[in-house]
Amino acid sequence: MAGHSKWANTKHRKAKQDASRAKVFTKYIREIVTAAKLGGADAASNPRLRAVVEKALSVNMTRDAINRAIQRGAGGEDNDDLNEVTYEGYGVGGVAVLVETMTDNLNRTVPDVRHCFSKTNGNLGTNGSVSYLFTKRGEISFEDVSLEDKIMDVALEAGADDIEIEEDGILVITSPESFGDVQDALTAAGLKSDNAEVVMSPSTKAEITDIEQAKQIMKMIDMLEDLDDVQNVYTNVEFSEEVLAQLDA
């Protein structure tokens, strides 16, 4: 169980996420529609759908809205032209960036994404330019470290790959395939996670110690997340403690 401190950076990113309910709802609806289209309307057998439904409920999206989105996806309504496209590039300081989008118009999305990179002194790259630096995996996080032993027992028995333990959190790591089974086992054991999702996790980190570069990275991420077509933004940035303190000031 190799632990590396990432909680401060993770929490800082979450604090910066888009606060607009309308934008958040739109992104979740698109993800629900696509998840239902690809894996079916039954959340019990569709881990991707189950994960996004839980996240949608956590931001107070109504069950009716969620069910309508599921039916749209499962029935193929208004969704034939919605495609998942991932863009890759670099921000300042050599920070690798993956941008996951869902779009019905590539002629709109490509220039919008490129603008976010160029406006913040980054560069949009070609397919494969940074994706090799990331691994797709499930992450299930808990803030209550007192549950360490129980979480470890249940998660490893259910097929988790690893568990990282820090002073302020526990992170259960799974393969994408076992994510649903591990999450179900933890829930059945009465262990409710604070966050659970399949993500692109960086294999190496690009540490930023300059506050101006850090501001540029944050601006780029915020600009990308503000785009309607963008679903997720992943980077390998790791801010130094000094930079984090200045960003939070």
Curated annotation (Swiss-Prot):
Domain of life: Bacteria
Main location: cytoplasm
GO molecular function, one term: DNA binding
Keyword Hydrolase: no
Subcellular localization(s) per the UniProt record: Cytoplasm
GO cellular component: cytosol
InterPro entries: Integrase-like_N (IPR017856), TACO1_YebC-like_2nd/3rd_dom (IPR048300), TACO1_YebC_N (IPR049083), Transcrip_reg_TACO1-like (IPR002876), Transcrip_reg_TACO1-like_dom3 (IPR026564), YebC-like (IPR029072)
Pfam families for this protein: TACO1_YebC_N, Transcrip_reg
UniProt key word DNA-binding: yes
GO BP terms, alphabetized: regulation of DNA-templated transcription
Family to which this protein belongs: Belongs to the TACO1 family.
Protein name, UniProt field: Probable transcriptional regulatory protein ACIAD2052
